[in-house]
Swiss-Prot record:
Upper taxonomic lineage: Archaea, Methanobacteriati, Methanobacteriota, Methanomada group, Methanococci
The organism of origin for this protein: Methanocaldococcus jannaschii (strain ATCC 43067 / DSM 2661 / JAL-1 / JCM 10045 / NBRC 100440)
Biological process (GO), any one: proteolysis
Regulation: Inhibited by 1,10-phenanthroline.
PROSITE patterns (UniProt xref): CBS, ZINC_PROTEASE
Pfam family, one: Peptidase_M50
Protein name, entry field: Zinc metalloprotease MJ0392
Residues that span the membrane, as ranges: 10-30, 33-53, 96-116, 125-145, 180-200, 251-271
Amino acid sequence: MNYSIRLFKIMGIPIELHITFILFLVVIIGLSIMNNSIFWAVLFILLFVSVVLHELGHSYVAKKYGVKIEKILLLPIGGVAMMDKIPKEGELRIGIAGPLVSFIIGIVLLIVSQFFDININGYPLLYTLSLLNLMLGGFNLIPAFPMDGGRILRAILSKKYGYLKSTKIAANIGKSLALIMLLFGLLSMNIILILVSLFVYFGAEQESRVVEVETIFKNIKAKDIMTPNPVYVTPDMSIEEFLDFMLKHKYFGYPVVENGKLVGCIGIGNIHKKEGTVRDYMEKPVVVSEDTDIKEILRKMANTDRVFVVEGGKLKGIISKTDILRAMSILELKEELKD
C-alpha cells in the first residue's frame, strides 16, 4: 500500500507527501482557525517548501555524481531524499549541499526582512522563516547520524580511520545525542523532542548496521557462505517419514528435490496434519545463484528463513539466517583482528 501522494516533479525528481504530513497539516490549519490566526499554517507550509529546497540541494549535487534519486518524501519531522547509495568520494559535498541551501535561504530572507516583511496577526513572516531556515541548516550540521553533519563527519574521518570506523564514531555520537534529547524530552514532557530523539537514535543505529554489513560482506557471494550439498527430501515422502527425517537431521527446513531438480521447500511450520505427503505441504523455494551478492540475499530473506543456491538447474547449497549470522561473526572477528 502506498502511504504517500505525489505532488509534482522538480529536476525530474518526484516530490511526495506522506499521509502523516497531510494529517499534521490538517491539525495545524485547524488550530490556526480555532485561534483565529493563519500565521502558523502559512509558516508551516513555507517551512516545508524550504525543506524541499534543502533536499533538492542534496539531490542536485548527488546527481552530479551519478546517483539516482527515487523521490523526495515529506514527513511531519522533515524531508528525506530517497536515493541510491552515495559514493564515498562525493559524500562530503552532497552532505554540505543541503545545509548550505538552508543557510542561503535564511540569510537572504533575513536581509530582506530588514527592509520589507509580511506581518500576519502581528507576527513577521519573513523574519521568522529566516530564523527557522538558519536553525534547519545548523541542526543538520550537528556531527551525528542521521543528520547531514554525521555524513560530513564520516567523510572527513574516513580519510584517517576508514569508512566503517568513521561510521561507528558518527553513529555513536548520534545515539548519545539522542539519549540526551530523550532525557530532556521526558523531563519536560515534550512529545516532539521525544519523537525526534527516537528518530535520531534509530536512524544512527540503522546507518551503522547497514554500513557494517556492507563492509563486512564486501565481495562475499552466496557460494562463500552457503552450506553445500544439503540433505533434501522427496515430494512423495509421507509426513510421518518427514518428521522422522527432521528428528534425525535436526534442521527446521529442507529443500524438496525430484529427479535431481529443486521443486519446493518445506519446514516444520508447513505441517498441519499427519496425512498426506511432502508434495501436499511444500512451498515455492526462494532461489539465488552462486554469485548472488549478500545485499540481494538479505533482500530475498526479508520474508523467508532460507534461500536455496541453484546453478545450472542443480541444487548447490542452502543459506539460512543461521549461516548469515555465523558468517557475520567470523568476518567481524577478521575485521577486528586487522586493526
